[in-house]
């Protein structure tokens, strides 16, 4: 063999193996990157020893798709429907929003009989914009740059794209998308993500506002789809410059997207209800007063790497803040002030519309020992079949200085069967005193049922529940209520003396405080409905850590007290495995080991 051929053979051999090694290195790099990205989660899940997966279970993807579509069909929430904008029986529509870049929603809409603007679809598919683009940080799955909304600016819409609107103008469907998951705090300062410092991630950015304004100019019907698992700020929904006729919410449905098309067409009548309170300004929440990345500092003033914050809003999160402060404003108590509920809340917890109408009657509430059974008759009084949801709320008596209580708490709910026009169904629920008890951490140090007047009400949402209770107390719109309540949907139950629920219903074990020393900052001021003005005066400055030099740090007033981490506390932070829970009970002491299935030799403690 000539030297030239030998050289060529060696060269070819080298090229092939170089490519193989390069591909292997690339694959290892990707896997290593993902492992590093989820390092904390993987370590917690798998531990620090090897785990062998011996499962041979397979799953039917068709079954998965059916379940996903069922979840969306039952859970998507119709928030607004002016002039019966929905449903639409087919039609020629234009689909807006960078979240449509994949073409998935377009396909299911076309499968449902809609004709979707192809020029606009091609424009998004070719766009360089992509929502959520950014870099990732290692360790805990957090995204440091993934909050770029990146909607297409109006300056990039060509004349041909805009000209296509007139041929597909039965409706404009605008998709607004937000991401977010565990391990990620959504930014309330968008200056690092293409926005401004006074914008938060869950409000519309400049490009989205301009998109809605331009769409309103070109279309008589505007439908907004909100694809977000987090509660977006809803200050835009009723603004005249956007002309929004209908709003449908769904939470990143993945394989269930087909049900969205069926809801728009009317093949499915929406029956979902909100599991959050949607407000005009997300900063109105009590929990936002100290939201941030609060870090402990070492004795030398450097950051320790550990974060901590006392949740001094206490129970007043979501509807338990908004509805409770509203009731106190109506009752003129607790320094609630001139609280304007209507200007604060766009859609209350439990809210949701239907394409038909329902009428409720004959509420019955019966107590049998520790169990309560509540029932009501639901009748479809509209012109199309649909399902309704009856939510049962409870109000427990509040004693200033005692256990904090929300104005109402959801006790149970039930969804009807598919009811044809004119059809009725009697629905009922059962709940126990344990389900509605409060925990008295200071005095009784166990669950309690306080003496006084209790109310059970059937309502469409949390706000209607409060109004029903207020009506039962003799209050009307003349007292500042947003609407008159329905006394027929509220029942009073009087407890003569306080009851302690200090025995576990299953094990019989004593129920009492276990973590009295878990709060590190003893000077924490907790929010109380006895004095709402504390929050208004930025009184909830209760975060530990430093407020300067760390991204997204600071409360409403821009500062926070600083605490130095102790050696003892640092040691607790550095614990691993079961010890890291600081659980004072050894898992082997569980009263009934059969209740705690575990692959190891010790029973796993209940969560």
Enumerate the predicted regions with their spans.
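C-terminal non-catalytic regions of proteins with extracellular/luminal or membrane-system context
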Residues: 1-607
